[in-house]
Amino acid sequence: VELNETGTQAFGLAFHELATNALKYGSARSPGGVLDIAWSIRSQPGKKAELVLTWSERSPEPLDAQDAEVLGGKKGFGTKLLDATIRGELGGSITSVKSDCGIDVTITVPYDRVTSRPKILKTAKR
């Protein structure tokens, strides 16, 4: 995926905010924590293509109540800024699902709003 300036700024902010929270409150705080990051382009007939980023953290032991509260919805300045950027500037969405040992965050944005190549390239068959 080749991002344009707006997409680069938005996803740079997203990675910074999510990594900061992982270090302070989440899976990166303790040895054995796991972080999985994936992205895909979702294309459905009759709908605009979307870029979908998933961030999944898992800690080897349950989070304490205060950390779970922060990861589960208490919004600091960085999270509010990220939300405003993804929803307001890009017309996308952010969802987060908290579990006892981690959090899953999904960011979905219109593909044509964040890429310098709005047409989806088909992979060549080998």
Where are these regions (language model features)?
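Conserved short strand/loop->alpha-helix "switch" segment adjacent to the catalytic nucleotide/phosphoryl-transfer site
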Residues: V1-A19, L23-V34
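A short coil/beta-turn micro-motif at the C-terminal edge
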Residues: R29, I41-S43, K98-G102, Y111, ...
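Short beta-strand patches within cytosolic ATPase/nucleotide-binding catalytic cores
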Residues: D36-A38, T95-V97, T106
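Glycine-rich/acidic phosphate-handling loop/turn and adjacent ATP-lid/helix
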Residues: W39-K80
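Glycine-rich nucleotide-binding loop
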Residues: E50, E61, S99-T106
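Glycine-rich ATP-binding loops of the HATPase_c
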Residues: E89-S99
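C-terminal end segment of the histidine kinase catalytic
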Residues: T108-R126
